[in-house]
């Protein structure tokens, strides 16, 4: 069960849409003063080298962040250069903040992105769960280098199970009870799909006003095909707004699709401005990451 290591996939196209959506969602939630409890159920190692052995072995950043940056540079030099959409710019600024020399050598995972967005008056709290023994140790070591204080808690635990004790969230320093949860298991175990649905259902019962984000792979597997449908049903039954962003980068020119070629981000109780911001961003990201044939993107909502 511990064969998956995100270091092999850091900065790929799935990370681009995952973190683009994550940043845009939290930015909206932070427009209100109330503190937020933020939970990352499958945190990974937190920070990754894009020039390290793991990422170079997978090479997936070449079809993700590296390709996006290259295409944006080309567009900026063209005659019809257009402003970069706000949500995409926020994502690019976040990546750049971890690479001050201008070269993309480091890629922040969701724990480091979320830590960078915590408001410094202790209003927001970050709770990180990672069960993989190696990644959990790396996460603790990486976070130890941050000036995190008591704003971050790390536990080597099953995020699916530990999430239950996080909701409803405790009152923040401002007295508010607000929560945002990111759920992105590896799905290498088939039961992960069912656990995601069960956890979202449980979350909505425990804390109906929370915002819940789910990343999922788009692969030829019945469980993967059914997951967004089941999340839509849960959201509609709970009368919550939802967004489903999908990106398929397409096949290589030789028709092959080495590695994952499509994934999605589903947001339950989505902020009302999010769909437009994501659509604007994807109008740039989608074409930039497209390859060969079979590429597409969509931003669906209720």
Regions found by a protein language model. Give the residues of each.
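Class I S-adenosyl-L-methionine-dependent methyltransferase catalytic core
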Residues: 1-302
């Amino acid at each position: 069960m511990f064969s998956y290591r995100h270091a092999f996939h850091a900065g790929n196209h799935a990370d681009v849409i995952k973190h683009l959506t994550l940043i845009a969602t939290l930015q909206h939630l932070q427009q209100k003063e109330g503190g937020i409890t933020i939970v990352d159920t499958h945190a990974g190692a937190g920070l990754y080298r894009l020039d390290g052995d793991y990422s170079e072995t997978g090479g997936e950043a070449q079809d993700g962040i590296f390709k996006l940056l290259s295409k944006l540079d080309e567009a900026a030099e063209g005659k019809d250069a257009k402003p970069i959409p706000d949500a995409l710019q926020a994502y690019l600024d976040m990546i750049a903040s971890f690479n001050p020399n201008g070269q993309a050598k480091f890629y922040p995972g969701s724990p480091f992105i979320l830590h960078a967005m915590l408001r410094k008056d202790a209003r927001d709290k970050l709770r990180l769960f990672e069960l993989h023994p190696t990644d959990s140790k790396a996460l603790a070591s990486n976070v130890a280098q941050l000036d995190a204080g008591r704003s971050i808690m790390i536990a080597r635990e099953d995020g699916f199970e530990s999430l239950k004790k996080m909701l409803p969230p405790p009152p923040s320093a401002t007295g508010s009870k607000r929560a945002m949860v990111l759920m992105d298991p590896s799905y290498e175990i088939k039961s992960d799909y069912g656990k995601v649905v069960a956890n979202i259902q449980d979350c909505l019962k425990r804390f109906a006003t929370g915002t819940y984000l789910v990343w999922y792979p788009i692969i030829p597997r019945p469980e993967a095909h059914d997951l967004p449908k089941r999340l839509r049903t849960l959201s509609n039954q709970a009368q919550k707004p939802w967004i489903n962003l999908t990106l398929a980068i397409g096949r290589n020119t030789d028709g092959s699709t080495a590695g994952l070629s499509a994934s999605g981000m589903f947001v339950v109780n989505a902020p009302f401005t999010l769909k437009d911001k994501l659509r604007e961003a994807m109008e740039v990201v989608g074409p930039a990451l497209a390859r060969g044939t079979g590429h597409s993107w969509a931003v669906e909502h209720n």
